[in-house]
């Protein structure tokens, strides 16, 4: 792939990692938003994700940063927020060869529990078919 997102592709998933050698989903979104568009996305640790208060504070910080949920069709640079079996998941909408998809860090583990996921680009419909649900699109004003 000859695209700016190629520098992230294939990097391994690691919990709470913010790059450049590994990412979790939030760390990847923060790095892409900062590196590509100069936007800040607040930190969200595993502890924050585990409580309603932590998630509410993160959502409030995102809104203070100029991000808002939109009902419009997604476009490059928007953030996808959805649910997975592990909880909340985020990614960035990216346009590659006239195809809009999601760049995200998948947290998959093998039978022994060893992380085997990583940064991938895939169509939203494929993500939804693989178990991600309740998609929301967030856009920076």
Residue ranges of predicted features:
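N-terminal capping segments
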Residues: 1-65, 85-89, 132, 138-141
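...with weaker cross-activation on analogous glycine-rich loops/strands in unrelated enzymes
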Residues: 46-124
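Glycine- and charge-enriched low-complexity intrinsically disordered segments
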Residues: 115-141
């Amino acid at each position: 792939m000859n695209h700016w997102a190629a520098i992230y592709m294939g990097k391994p998933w690691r919990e709470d990692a913010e790059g450049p050698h590994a990412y979790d989903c939030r760390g990847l979104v923060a790095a892409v938003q900062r590196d590509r568009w100069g936007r800040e996305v607040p930190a969200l640790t595993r502890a924050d994700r585990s409580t309603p208060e932590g998630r509410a504070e993160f959502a409030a910080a995102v809104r203070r940063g100029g991000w808002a949920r939109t009902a419009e069709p997604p476009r490059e640079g928007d953030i996808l927020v959805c649910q997975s079996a592990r909880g909340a998941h985020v990614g960035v909408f990216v346009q590659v060869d006239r195809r809009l998809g999601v760049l995200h860090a998948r947290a998959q583990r093998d039978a022994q529990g060893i992380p085997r996921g990583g940064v991938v680009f895939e169509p939203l419909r494929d993500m939804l078919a693989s178990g991600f649900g309740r998609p929301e699109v967030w856009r920076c004003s």
